[in-house]
Amino acid sequence: TYNYLLMQHAADPDSLVHEWAESIVGDQYPVPDRILHFTEILVQDYLSQEMCDNRPPRGAYDLFATEGGTAAMCYIFDSLQENFLNKGDGIVLMVPAFTPYIEIPQLSRYQFRVTKIHANRMNNEGMHLWQYSDEDIDRLKSPKIKALFVTNPSNPPSYTLSPDTMARIVSIVRNDNPNLMIITDDVYGTFSPHFRSFMAEIPYNTLCVYSFSKYFGATGWRNAVIALHEFNLFDKL
């Protein structure tokens, strides 16, 4: 990691070691408080590789380190309620999903109007494909739908969205519902070869949650990050 940052990003070695030493000792508040400087550079490269298949969009992502993916979800729901969504506003939840995404919107402090769309497509042999129908995806065209929550790959089936579904959602955002906020939880994306997140396909509208715990087998460490492109819908709204 030390050599990588020096060789790939021309990091000042003294500043880098100083940041790491202070992080381990914990004698100061982190600066910047959302994520440390060199940590952000390193994680940006990692997300570009794993979430964008080494083909990231132009520009950089602003990152916010959190105490695991569940904490990231809590911060996001609170921020959405405080700044973007009111009680009764419509959101779409693509299921199966990580359980808190189902339970949190039901709390009295949020009371969002939740529309669930289910991955219930079958093949000709009656086998479950864990994919979504075009008719259900087209419900996102309504401007009454303010936010889309998706776990990709899904949890627990661990199926990625099909390329056709990804393309259909991107088209809907661009042509029908340009103010749709997409919150995508891509914790299992690192298990899928050549994975492309919504943060790669439509970064302007996307807020991404990624946790390191599953891929690195370190659930108890509670390490995750929220990623938002520097040019984004949320700042506009």
Question: In which residue ranges do the predicted regions lie?
Answer:
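Conserved core of the PLP fold type I
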Residues: 7-176, 189-203, 207
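Conserved core segment of the aminotransferase class I/II
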Residues: 12-13, 204-237
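Residue-level marker for buried hydrophobic side chains located in beta-strands
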Residues: 182-183
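Walker B catalytic acidic pair
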Residues: 186
